[in-house]
Amino acid sequence: MSSQITNKIKSDKLIQQIKTFAKNTKVLLVGGVIRDFCLGKENHDKDIIVVEKDAKIFAQELAKELDATYIPLDEINHIYRLVLRDKINFIDITNPIENSLQKDLERRDLRMNAIAYDLQDDKFIDLFSGFKDLNDEKINIISEQNLVDDPLRLLRIFRFQAITGFDIDENLIKIVKQHKNLINKPAKERINYELMKLFSGNYTVKALENLDKSGILCEILPIFNDVKKVPPNSHHHLPLIGHSIE
């Protein structure tokens, strides 16, 4: 799989422009772009980590090179976005957490989202068996603590299932259930965004069934507490909650 993804990276015009511009600066692709390439999906939002150079300066310089719009998304966490002229492609640029690539990757949500690719050395960095999960079509988290630190990830697990159709282990559903009360901590806008992504997937029913098992569904949409009380009737073999999900 990795050789096929390498070929996609090397044939991607924008990625190669970034590589050429970076020259001797260590720059890594990370997260969604690699996952999407593995899944054969288009990607218009590329995340890159800049090592040993200030991400803000790099982002400003790259914006000039690409004639892109520079947006400081989060100055505190040093996250900067470039919007390309086509208004379709985006580049998010940051430095690694605590100046450590390993610490940055280990704080991400899913193992399949924690694969990095070193543009200068042309090699993958897969510390958490992300490629294995992609091959096995499994969704696994890096750590339980990461869910507690950012509770939106409790919902993102199922958003990615809706998009990929990958399986979620029962133990992971139990872990999510233990922390379900945290899901309302993130801003409503962030929750709504994840729900929109979930409902746009090809495997929404599968994801909703597990979202219900985890208890998250009733936490974010309390109306389903009443829906679950309605039993099957002569017109449908499932309770109302099952019928609603179908």
Q: Where are these predicted regions, by residue range?
A:
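Catalytic cores of the polymerase beta-like nucleotidyltransferase superfamily
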Residues: 1-246
